[in-house]
Amino acid sequence: MAETTPEQPLEEIDIDSYTTESEVPVEGEYTSESMASAFGEPQPAAGLGRRKNAIARVRIVPGTGKWKVNGRTLEDYFPNKVHQQEVNEPFKVLELDNRYDVIARISGGGVSGQAGALRLGVARALNEADVDNNRGALKKAGYLKRDDRAVERKKAGLKKARKAPQYSKR
């Protein structure tokens, strides 16, 4: 059996002389994980949003605020001003109007669900573009949370999801 005692005594180590900070020089002054902080300018990013049965794949690139939704402008795709405002809310909260161009592909669902999916996709893309600066405001406004409400299924023996047929006592 091998001996467990070392042949030479261990050297005394002065613990006070060591620090937890690295001695490697850091390039640049930013401490952010995000690319925008590293370069100081808007960066392209992508996000996926879902709402009801709608799915929106969103890509944002630095630009002048142009929207392309399934190859059409925002005003053509969402003629209702309420839906246009809903989709623009993440930019308004971050005060980034006309700083990014948005390219989106939306499929499934209706108009309202598609607008909600697009808003979530835009918010996630903005979050990815600059996590440190954008995440707090987007999270506080509730734009990073998926709205998981969906249509309740119809149950057997009922006319709709909850509506029962008329009850007759006699």
Swiss-Prot record:
One of its GO terms (biological process) is translation. The keyword Ribonucleoprotein applies. GO terms for molecular function: RNA binding; structural constituent of ribosome. Keywords: Ribonucleoprotein, Ribosomal protein. It holds the Pfam family Ribosomal_S9. Residues 1-47 are annotated as: Disordered. This is Small ribosomal subunit protein uS9. It comes from Streptomyces coelicolor (strain ATCC BAA-471 / A3(2) / M145).
